[in-house]
C-alpha cells in the first residue's frame, strides 16, 4: 500500500502563503520559511495601521478645521465649544471637507455657530 501524505493540502497551504507575499523582494517572496515571517510581520503592520489611520485622519481634520477657523477669527477649540453649546452636530470629517472645498460656506457656518 502506498504511503499516505498530505500533499494536496500542504501545497495549497504553501501556495496561499506565497500568494500573500507576491511582489516581495528576494527570498522574502519565494523561500517559504522567510515568506511566513514576512507575511506575519506585514499582517501585524496592517492590523496596527488600520487603527492608526483613524487617529491620523482625525488629527488631519482637526488641523484643517483649525486653520480655516483661524482665518475666520476664532480657534478650533472655541468653535467646537460653541458647536456643543448650540447642539450643532457636524462631524469633523464633513467640516474639514467644507473648509477645504468651500471656504465661503465654512465662513457662513462659523458665523452662524459663533454668533
Curated annotation (Swiss-Prot):
GO MF terms, alphabetically ordered: rRNA binding; structural constituent of ribosome
Disulphides: none
CDD domains xref list: Ribosomal_L20 (cd07026)
Gene Ontology cellular component annotations, sorted alphabetically: ribonucleoprotein complex; ribosome
Gene Ontology annotations of biological process type: ribosomal large subunit assembly; translation
Pfam families xref list: Ribosomal_L20 (PF00453)
Keywords on record: Ribonucleoprotein, Ribosomal protein, RNA-binding, rRNA-binding
Source domain of life: Bacteria
Similarity remark: Belongs to the bacterial ribosomal protein bL20 family.
Primary role: Binds directly to 23S ribosomal RNA and is necessary for the in vitro assembly process of the 50S ribosomal subunit. It is not involved in the protein synthesizing functions of that subunit.
HAMAP family named in the record: Ribosomal_bL20 (MF_00382)
Entry protein name: Large ribosomal subunit protein bL20
Species for this entry: Chlorobium phaeovibrioides (strain DSM 265 / 1930)
This protein's encoding gene: rplT
Amino acid at each position: 500500500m502506498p504511503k499516505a501524505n498530505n500533499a494536496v493540502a500542504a501545497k495549497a497551504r504553501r501556495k496561499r502563503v506565497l500568494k500573500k507575499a507576491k511582489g516581495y523582494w528576494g527570498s522574502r517572496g519565494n523561500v517559504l520559511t522567510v515568506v511566513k515571517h514576512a507575511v506575519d510581520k506585514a499582517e501585524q503592520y496592517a492590523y496596527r495601521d488600520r487603527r492608526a489611520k483613524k487617529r491620523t485622519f482625525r488629527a488631519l481634520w482637526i488641523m484643517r478645521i483649525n486653520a480655516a477657523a483661524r482665518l475666520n477669527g476664532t480657534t478650533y477649540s472655541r468653535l467646537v465649544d460653541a458647536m456643543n453649546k448650540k447642539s450643532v452636530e457636524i462631524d469633523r470629517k464633513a467640516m474639514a471637507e467644507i473648509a477645504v472645498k468651500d471656504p465661503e460656506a465654512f465662513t457662513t457656518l462659523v458665523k452662524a455657530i459663533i454668533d
